[in-house]
Design a protein with these regions (language model features):
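N-terminal strand-loop-strand
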Residues: 1-12, 131, 135
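The catalytic Nudix box helix
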Residues: 12-45
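Active-site-proximal alpha-helix that buttresses catalytic centers in soluble enzyme cores
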Residues: 15, 26, 125-159, 164, ...
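A short coil-to-beta-strand element that immediately follows conserved catalytic motifs
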Residues: 38-48, 288-295
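Active-site-adjacent beta-strand/loop module that shapes the phosphate/pyrophosphate-binding cleft
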Residues: 48-80, 93
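NUDIX/MutT-family hydrolases
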Residues: 73-120
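Generic beta-sheet signal
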Residues: 128-131, 329-338
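Domain-level recognition of soluble alpha/beta enzyme cores
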Residues: 351-381
Length: 406
């Protein structure tokens, strides 16, 4: 508990989130600033709401916290924290539940204490954490200018019309087979600018012979067959694109979220994005990452996977159930595709109807679902579910500027 000389009260440590700081990162930072204790977060407690003097409502989120040793990998990932000045916090102390109930000034803080004591007496205070992560998106595939030309057409060079004549200063109507967006005004290398020339006479073409017609038809048929085979191959072997540029930035900001919950190990599906999003966290913090083949479909084996869909779903659910039964602190699951939805569905099955209603059906890119699990006499029980997102700014997405009055 902390004592604030300005208000002459005893309360729980708390504070405001900085601009762009996730709430859970703010929670562990404020506790360290005000008490010197380095903690990781467990299950959430009741959110406190009360009115301020100006009529505004203040909302404060609380979690069960566990002190961590300074050398813990989850702690090493955090930025250094400076202690709060004595003018803000002049005393900190541990107290027994009975003494704390007498010392706490606010009634809401005493309710939080009663909640924690009740959970401890019922054996529900200690929980493990399962975190499901949806990795960031891949960058959109670049558009190849060559592939933009119609199949079988012959792309014209910039500055020439489809009939082979040189363009004048005014843009002619593009002929069939011309590249969309190509310039129709030629320039002279080293010259001052666009070349304005009189239209040249079109080059006479030889009359088509039966052999030429047959050759053109054969080329056209080969192009159509090649395009069809490429389309079928792309459908049968979906690409495994890497993490996009914005997703890479999200992977660095994800470190603060994972550190707040004390994640020390991770499991990942075989997809590139699921593995790459963990790279900064694993490299800096030294966390363990285990590749689980059962959480993905090997590229090139999609047809066989469709025939074995029920068996694959059963393996994914069994994997999730095994993680729920473990008392291993905080575990991260980085999964893409249908396997992630199956894991979320399995986690929801271990909670009450209220938990199911509060838990998300799907996750956004860079978002995590945090499930807090207690081990009951009849097996694991999900007692709380929360979602958090990285606050990475995407410069590629234009922001809406506030209008100014003149």
């Amino acid at each position: 508990m902390i004592h604030r000389p300005r208000y002459h009260d005893w309360s729980w440590p708390k504070g405001k989130a900085e601009n762009g700081e996730p709430l859970v990162a703010a929670a562990v930072r404020e506790v360290e600033e005000e008490t010197g204790q380095v903690i990781t977060l467990g299950a959430p407690l009741t959110t406190q709401r009360y009115r301020l003097g100006g009529g505004q409502t203040k909302e404060v989120h609380y979690w069960v916290g566990t002190p961590m040793p300074v050398g813990d990998p989850a702690v090493r990932l955090r930025a250094p924290v400076a202690r709060a000045p004595r003018t803000e916090i002049d005393q900190t102390t541990w107290a027994t539940p009975a003494a704390a109930a007498d010392m706490l000034t606010r009634r809401g803080d005493r309710r939080l204490l009663a909640d924690v004591v009740a959970r401890a007496r019922e054996g529900r205070l200690a929980t493990s954490t399962i975190i499901v992560l949806r990795p960031g998106a891949a960058d959109p595939a670049p558009i190849d200018a060559a592939s933009a030309a119609p199949v079988g057409g012959r792309a014209s060079a910039p500055g020439t019309s489809a009939s082979g004549g040189t363009a004048s200063g005014s843009a002619p109507t593009p002929g069939p087979g011309s590249v969309p967006g190509s310039s129709s005004v030629p320039t002279v290398p080293g010259g001052p600018g666009p070349l304005a020339a009189a239209p040249a006479a079109p080059t006479p073409r030889p009359a088509p012979t039966p052999a030429m017609v047959a050759s053109a038809a054969a080329r056209r048929a080969a192009q159509v067959e090649r395009a069809s085979s490429l389309t079928a191959e792309a459908a049968a072997h979906p690409a495994d694109p890497p993490l996009g540029r914005f997703g890479v930035r999200q992977s660095f900001d994800l470190i603060d979220l994972l550190s707040a919950f004390g994640v020390g190990r991770a499991f990942t599906s075989p997809s590139a994005r699921a593995r790459q999003v963990l790279a900064p966290w694993a490299a800096v913090g030294g966390g363990s990452v285990t590749l689980v083949e059962a959480l993905g479909v090997p590229v090139g084996d999609e047809a066989g996977a469709d025939k074995d869909a029920d068996a694959r779903a059963g393996r994914v659910r069994a994997f999730a159930a095994q993680r729920l039964r473990e008392q291993a602190g905080a575990t991260l699951l980085s999964v893409t595709g249908a396997a992630r939805d199956l894991i979320v569905e399995e986690i929801r099955a271990y909670g009450s109807s209220a938990i199911v209603g509060a838990s998300p059906v799907s996750l956004g890119h860079g978002q995590i679902m945090v499930a807090h699990v207690e081990q009951g006499t009849d097996g694991p029980v999900v007692v709380a579910v929360e979602t958090h997102s990285v606050t990475t700014k995407n410069p590629a997405v234009p922001t809406r500027r506030a209008s100014r009055r003149h």
